[in-house]
From Swiss-Prot:
<dbReference type="InterPro" id="IPR001545">
    <property type="entry name" value="Gonadotropin_bsu"/>
</dbReference>
<dbReference type="GO" id="GO:0007283">
    <property type="term" value="P:spermatogenesis"/>
</dbReference>
<keyword id="KW-0964">Secreted</keyword>
<feature type="disulfide bond">
    <location>
        <begin position="38"/>
        <end position="122"/>
    </location>
</feature>
<dbReference type="GO" id="GO:0007186">
    <property type="term" value="P:G protein-coupled receptor signaling pathway"/>
</dbReference>
<dbReference type="InterPro" id="IPR029034">
    <property type="entry name" value="Cystine-knot_cytokine"/>
</dbReference>
<feature type="disulfide bond">
    <location>
        <begin position="21"/>
        <end position="69"/>
    </location>
</feature>
<dbReference type="InterPro" id="IPR006208">
    <property type="entry name" value="Glyco_hormone_CN"/>
</dbReference>
<dbReference type="GO" id="GO:0005615">
    <property type="term" value="C:extracellular space"/>
</dbReference>
<dbReference type="InterPro" id="IPR018245">
    <property type="entry name" value="Gonadotropin_bsu_CS"/>
</dbReference>
<dbReference type="GO" id="GO:0045670">
    <property type="term" value="P:regulation of osteoclast differentiation"/>
</dbReference>
<feature type="disulfide bond">
    <location>
        <begin position="46"/>
        <end position="100"/>
    </location>
</feature>
<comment type="function">
    <text>Together with the alpha chain CGA constitutes follitropin, the follicle-stimulating hormone, and provides its biological specificity to the hormone heterodimer. Binds FSHR, a G protein-coupled receptor, on target cells to activate downstream signaling pathways. Follitropin is involved in follicle development and spermatogenesis in reproductive organs.</text>
</comment>
<dbReference type="GO" id="GO:0010628">
    <property type="term" value="P:positive regulation of gene expression"/>
</dbReference>
<dbReference type="GO" id="GO:0007179">
    <property type="term" value="P:transforming growth factor beta receptor signaling pathway"/>
</dbReference>
<dbReference type="GO" id="GO:0016914">
    <property type="term" value="C:follicle-stimulating hormone complex"/>
</dbReference>
<protein>
    <recommendedName>
        <fullName>Follitropin subunit beta</fullName>
    </recommendedName>
</protein>
């Protein structure tokens, strides 16, 4: 019986450690209104789980701050969106995460909502790879 409990605890520990906050490859839709269509690009972003807790009894004197998996370091890359009008700026700059950590959500630079539009959302019907 003790070996079963040990195996269970070990599997739980392994699941938590292996699903930590880390870089992951994602595909995002890039669009420029002047170009009237979207392109898909590959980039890296942070994904995974962070230790957090939600208290049953809320204490107004002690705010409940949830940690999220977010970027620690960013670089920016630029891509040219094809098909833009000659007078339009066809360059699009997007963030690429280079390091991740568990921290507070910075609403100035991150969509902190429960459900955002998602990285593959496109306002236009046409998507180019």
């Amino acid at each position: 019986m003790k070996s079963v409990q040990f195996c269970f605890l070990f599997c739980c520990w392994k699941a938590i450690c292996c699903s930590s906050c880390e870089l992951t490859n994602i595909t995002i839709a890039v669009e420029k209104e002047e170009c009237r269509f979207c392109i898909s690009i590959n980039t890296t972003w942070c994904s995974g789980y962070c230790y957090t807790r939600d208290l049953v009894y809320k204490d107004p004197a002690r705010p409940n701050i949830q940690k999220i998996c977010t970027f620690k370091e960013l670089v920016y890359e630029t891509v040219r969106v094809p098909g833009c009008a000659h007078h339009a700026d066809s360059l699009y700059t997007y963030p690429v995460a280079t390091e991740c950590h568990c921290g507070n959500c910075d609403s100035d630079s991150t969509d902190c909502t429960v459900r955002g539009l998602g990285p593959s959302y496109c306002s236009f019907g046409e998507m180019k790879e």
